[in-house]
Amino acid sequence: DPEDYMARSAVKWLIRLGVNVLTMSPGKKDYGHHNYPLECIEKAMAWLKLHGNEKIGIAGASTTGTLALTAASIFSDISLTIAMTPSDFVWQGFMQGKKDGCKEWPIEGESLFSYKGKPLPYMPFRYQHPDYWRIISEESKRTGNMVASRKLFDDSEAAHPITEEEFIKVENIRGKLFLVGAEDDALWDTAKYIRRMEKRLAEKPHSCEVEAVVYEHGTHFVFPDGMLKTMLPVGSALFVKLAFSAAKKYPRECKTARIDIDRRMTRVICDWRDKK
């Protein structure tokens, strides 16, 4: 949802750095991603240019971190890409809501994203409805996390090794690429995915300048500390502790990671903003 509280809070943090921000969403109150048309990004870029924005950057976290990478790999006008806890491949589309007692389910034959009317090649999930949600629910209870889908992703990749066409072509990204994640991410193995992207870039010609950082402890919420405080002025650290078990065990390390992310991301954005 473009009016989502977390999205609006992220916008406030970014605006303080002197950049204009436009939020993107599949639809109002829609937290699923299935065949999301990348033409929406194209239209947004055109609108921003029409209104005097000469530079285009894109940022996302979690699934939208993967969206940011995918869009930047296709649209060469994007000169800054920030991906927090992303995957390096496109996966099967999913919906959220209520269905047969499940809060989320994959959609057969649909990708996370589409372009020119066609779904992008994607990794199918090992578990389909209703087993998909059962696995997530069981793992969340077992690990003490708000959401734990790492087993879902690990088992899916084991059953269906990711093909070249399913990997995001990060070597096509222009300008600055900033990747951030944590080893203890409960949703998916973003640390592995980030290292895989670094390896891909080392092996392929590319023009982007990449900065990748992976923290031992940071959870799925690898947000800049100031951004999280904007979202939750009181109790931001407590909220992360309640959401993810790693934050309960390593609160100081998670806090230190968020402060470092804030410093790094602020520098990256300001350098890009000021570059002639």
Where do the language-model regions lie?
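Short beta-strand/loop motif that positions the catalytic acidic residue
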Residues: I173, L179-G181, D185
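Short alpha-helix in the alpha/beta-hydrolase fold that links the catalytic acid
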Residues: G175, D189-E203, M227-L228
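C-terminal catalytic histidine-bearing segment of alpha/beta-hydrolase fold enzymes
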Residues: R195, H206-K276
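Short glycine-enriched nucleophile-adjacent loop
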Residues: G65-S76, T81
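Acidic catalytic loop of the alpha/beta-hydrolase fold
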Residues: D184-W188, T219-V222
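Catalytic nucleophile-loop/oxyanion-hole region of alpha/beta-hydrolase
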Residues: M24-G57
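Accessory cap/linker subdomain of secreted extracellular hydrolases
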Residues: I82-V170
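Short amphipathic alpha-helix adjacent to the substrate-entry channel of hydrolases
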Residues: Y5-M24
